[in-house]
Amino acid sequence: MAKLTVSDGYSFNQTDFDFSSLYYGWSYTRTGTLFRVDYGNGYVDEFRGTGFKYNSSGEPTGGTVTGYSGFDYGTRLFFIEGGSVAVTKIAGAAKTYSTSDDINVIAEVLRGNDTLTGANLADVMLGFGGNDSISGKGGNDILFGYDGNDTIIGGTGADEIDGGTGSDTASYANASVGVVASLANPAGNTNEAAGDIYTSIESLAGSSYADRLYGDYGSNFLSGGVGNDYLTGSGGGDWLYGGTGADQLVGGSNTDRFIFRALSDSIGSGRDTILDFTLAQNDRIDLSAIDASHALAGNQAFTYVGTAAFSGKAGELRYDKGASDTYIFADVNGDKKADFSIHLDDAVTLAKGYFIL
């Protein structure tokens, strides 16, 4: 699991890696753990690792690189750590003027579940293999996850967010205010999502504030995070998770799943409302992550009792159907009082099969 980190004040472009200048340095430092190239113009390449060996001309011929940094007049511009690649692969790439082999070297370093963090200017970062976390921070960034299930945080600026293959998420978890973010119509995005465009993104994650998240016509996973969020799945079979706060959830067409992972997700003034729970579309309410009984060890499933009153046994799930609303209640400690509740904005006759317990 490698880490690539960019320093503020430097605009980093990962596609610009070109090791062909390594043999044209002004001075060199060669030890078993350090290969350092000073180009005499303020720029320095520094490779750290183990078992470095050199031939009679001073060219590196063996060992493993585990860290790589670029410096400009003593200021580190970026560094890569935590990965590894054979010295011979970097040395081989340095002997060609094509950048494709240089990019392949970096792709090998970033083949795992890596963390890439940009800085305050426009960056270009590529995750390659694995389930990566890529954060652009400031600037108008181009962020590409490639393979795996990636989480991409554009940050401030108008960012191009491309998940590549896998199930990928555009996240606004670090946003300083709530956002409007839409996979179907990103032109309407606001705040830190403004100007962002999405390619091959299946999921959206909100901030710690009130967000409005919209899916597209595919199957999406929308996660509100903290705050009173509004989530709309649109088309496709969507999974919606409001998180904490009084959230409003709209699945849209097709079979949708409304997910609750903790009692705090929908309790008291933070109770969630499902605006379009539709039996004909086989919508489901997923409570499987919640331990239904605090009286027993482990994660217990709820016992569905329909419209019957709580009996005093921990783990019961019931509902009340009104003229235009339905309320779902859960008792996890057996005191006959609801510890968790969900509001359905319609009169719905429920059955056990509509829940994932």
How would you label these PLM feature ranges?
Residues 1-27, 117, 122-199, 210-303:
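Acidic, glycine-rich calcium-binding repeat modules characteristic of RTX/beta-roll
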Residues 2-14, 29-32, 37-40, 47-64, ...:
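Extended, solvent-exposed, non-transmembrane regions
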Residues 11-56, 67, 255-357:
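Acidic glycine/aspartate-rich repeat arrays in secreted/surface proteins
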Residues 43-50, 74-90, 180, 197-200, ...:
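Short amphipathic beta-strand/extended segments with alternating polar/hydrophobic composition
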Residues 71-126, 204-205, 213:
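Extended, small-residue-rich solenoid/repeat segments and analogous flexible loops
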Residues 106-111, 249-250, 348-350:
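N-terminal helix-cap/turn-to-beta initiation motif at the start of protein domains
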